[in-house]
C-alpha cells in the first residue's frame, strides 16, 4: 500500500503542505498540484485572501521540492468562472445567498482532481481539508474532524461513495496547532503562513462589484416592503441584500429593521423586526445522501444551515421529488435560501442540499 500514488491538491498554505508531508512520511508516492482558478493579482486581491496566486504557487512548489515529489499547476480558470463565479452571480441576481466554496469543492476540487488523477495514474487524491473518512461495513462514511474548531465537513456533504473510496484527508485527526508544528519541524516555508480568508475572488467583500463586472449591468432599485406588503422605502438592488442583514439598509425606522425575505419576481426586499427572522422549518432542494440511500422518514438527526453554526436537532420529512423538509425542535434565526443545510448523526455527515424558498423548489 505504501507505494500507491496520490495526487495532492496544494494551495500553498500550511494545511495542504502538511497533508503532503504526512502522506510522504507514510510511504505514498505523491504528486503535487495546484489549480489555477483566478487571476488574483489582476483583481487586486491582497495576500492573505488568496488560494492560487503566484506566491501561493511558489510556496507549494517549494514544499513539493523539499519533500521530493513533482508538482504541476492546472489551469482551470474557465471552469471556475463557469461553475463557481457565474453560479455565484446568478444566485444573487435571483435573490438567494450562495456558498461558492461548496461549488468549488464539487466542481473543481473533486470532479476535476479525479480527472487529473486518472490521467496521472493516481489511485487517490488528497486535500488539506479537516475531515475524516472511515469504512463502515460496505459503506464509506464522512465524519467531522477531531478539531471541531477547524472542521470542514459542512462543505464536503456532496461527496459520493465512489469519491470517498478514493479521497484522503490526512489532517482529519490533527489539530491546527499540530499542523503548524509539523510544518515547522519539517522546515516548510509556509509553517507560519496565515490562513486564507473570505471568498477568494471577491476583494474586500464587495460582491456587487463582481456581479456588475460579470454582467455588465447596474442593479435595479426596487421597493422595501414591510410584513404587510406596504412600501416603506427604496432599495439599491436585490444583489446588495441577504436574509438577516441590518447594515446598509439606509431606511428610516423607529427600531431595528432586518431583511426578512427577498422577492426577486417583484424586485422587492421584505423587511421587519428581528422576531420575524425566526422559523422552525425549511425546505432543502436536491438532497444528497452520502450513503446513496435516503433513510426511512420521518428521520431524527441534527442539521446546520450555515458553515460556522452549531447543528440543531430536527426531524426530516420528504418534500417533492428530491427534497426534504427540516422541522427543528426550536426556531432558528435567519435561515437563508441559497445556503446549504447539512445533516449530521453525531459526528457523521449524512448529506445535505440547498435551502429553498418554498416546497415548490424541491
Across the structure, where does each feature detected by a protein language model lie?
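AMP-forming adenylation/ATP pyrophosphatase catalytic core
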Residues: 126-134, 138-362
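ATP-dependent adenylation/nucleotidyltransferase module used to activate substrates
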Residues: 1-157, 168, 177-178, 184
Amino acid at each position: 500500500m505504501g507505494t500507491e500514488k496520490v495526487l495532492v491538491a496544494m494551495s500553498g498554505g500550511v494545511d495542504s503542505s502538511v497533508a503532503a508531508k504526512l502522506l510522504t512520511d507514510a510511504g505514498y508516492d505523491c504528486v503535487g498540484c495546484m489549480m489555477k482558478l483566478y487571476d488574483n493579482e489582476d483583481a487586486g486581491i491582497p495576500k492573505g485572501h488568496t488560494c492560487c496566486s503566484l506566491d501561493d504557487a511558489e510556496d507549494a512548489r517549494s514544499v513539493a521540492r523539499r519533500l521530493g515529489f513533482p508538482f504541476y499547476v492546472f489551469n482551470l480558470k474557465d471552469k471556475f468562472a463557469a461553475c463557481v463565479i457565474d453560479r455565484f452571480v446568478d444566485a444573487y441576481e435571483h435573490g438567494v445567498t450562495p456558498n461558492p466554496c461548496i461549488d468549488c469543492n464539487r466542481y473543481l476540487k473533486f470532479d476535476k482532481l479525479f480527472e487529473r488523477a486518472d490521467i496521472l495514474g493516481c489511485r487517490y487524491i488528497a486535500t488539506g481539508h479537516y475531515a475524516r473518512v472511515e469504512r463502515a461495513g460496505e459503506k464509506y462514511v464522512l465524519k467531522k474532524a477531531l478539531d471541531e474548531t477547524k472542521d470542514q465537513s459542512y462543505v464536503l456533504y456532496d461527496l459520493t461513495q465512489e469519491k470517498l473510496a478514493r479521497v484522503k484527508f490526512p489532517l482529519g485527526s490533527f489539530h491546527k496547532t499540530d499542523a503548524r508544528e509539523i510544518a515547522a519541524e519539517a522546515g516548510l516555508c509556509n509553517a507560519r503562513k496565515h490562513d486564507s480568508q473570505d471568498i477568494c475572488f471577491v476583494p474586500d467583500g464587495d460582491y456587487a462589484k463582481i456581479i456588475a463586472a460579470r454582467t455588465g449591468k447596474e442593479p435595479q432599485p426596487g421597493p422595501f416592503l414591510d410584513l404587510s406588503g406596504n412600501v416603506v422605502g427604496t432599495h439599491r438592488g436585490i444583489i446588495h441584500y441577504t436574509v438577516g442583514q441590518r447594515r446598509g439598509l439606509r431606511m428610516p425606522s423607529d427600531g431595528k429593521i432586518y431583511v426578512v425575505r427577498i422577492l426577486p419576481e417583484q424586485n422587492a426586499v421584505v423587511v421587519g423586526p428581528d422576531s420575524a427572522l425566526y422559523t422552525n422549518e425549511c425546505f432543502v432542494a436536491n438532497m444528497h445522501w452520502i450513503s446513496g440511500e435516503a433513510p426511512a422518514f420521518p428521520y431524527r438527526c441534527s442539521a446546520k444551515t450555515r458553515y460556522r453554526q452549531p447543528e440543531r436537532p430536527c426531524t426530516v420529512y420528504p418534500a417533492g421529488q428530491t427534497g426534504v423538509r427540516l422541522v427543528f425542535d426550536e426556531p432558528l434565526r435567519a435561515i437563508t435560501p441559497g445556503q446549504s443545510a447539512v445533516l449530521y448523526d453525531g459526528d457523521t455527515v449524512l448529506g445535505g442540499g440547498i435551502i429553498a424558498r418554498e416546497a415548490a423548489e424541491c
